[in-house]
Amino acid sequence: MAKKKTQQKTNAMRMVEQHKVPYKEYEFAWSEDHLSAESVAESLGIEKGRIFKTLVTVGNKTGPVVAVIPGNQELDLKKLAKASGNKKVEMLHLKDLEATTGYIRGGCSPIGMKKQFPTYLAEEAQQYSAIIVSAGKRGMQIELAPEAILSLTNGQFAEITTKE
């Protein structure tokens, strides 16, 4: 009897399932040159605004702060600092990402990090019933309700993107 191939679950997927949150999983071929949210949107055939990227910053008072923003927008560090109660925040050095979060560049999910950090989801997420974030592994994404992300991360909506 042939064994059924089992899908490897990430920490993010296990946490979502543990809390009985409905989600949809996406897989795509990735490369080191194509880790951007735009590349993911193109690979999946989904509008760029629904693909959200997870950025990890460091606040002068709070330490690590997680920002989840639309892939087609940029993080406003001043707005994130204000929302998180810091005087300033700066991007976490890439070399520190895995040690801090348990995830690597291109596979960083806001869900299931090593520790729970203050998490801010861009208010733009409220216009969608579901958004897509990294599942915690390159080439894997999960789609779930923005409110579910906030619940799983104890996060909150905030105005944290640059407005053109």
Curated annotation (Swiss-Prot):
InterPro entries: Prolyl-tRNA_editing_YbaK/EbsC (IPR004369), YbaK/aa-tRNA-synt-asso_dom_sf (IPR036754), YbaK/aa-tRNA-synth-assoc-dom (IPR007214). Coiled coil: none annotated. The keyword Aminoacyl-tRNA synthetase does not apply. It comes from Enterococcus faecalis (strain ATCC 700802 / V583). GO terms for biological process: translation. It is an enzyme of class 4 (lyase). Belongs to the prolyl-tRNA editing family. YbaK/EbsC subfamily. Gene3D superfamilies: YbaK/aminoacyl-tRNA synthetase-associated domain. Its EC number is 4.2.-.-. Affects the expression of the receptor, named binding substance, that mediates mating aggregate formation. Could be a regulatory protein that suppresses the function or expression of ebsA and/or ebsMB. GO terms for molecular function: aminoacyl-tRNA deacylase activity; lyase activity. It comes from the Bacteria. Transmembrane segments: none annotated. Keywords: Lyase, Protein biosynthesis, Transcription, Transcription regulation. This is Putative Cys-tRNA(Pro)/Cys-tRNA(Cys) deacylase EbsC.
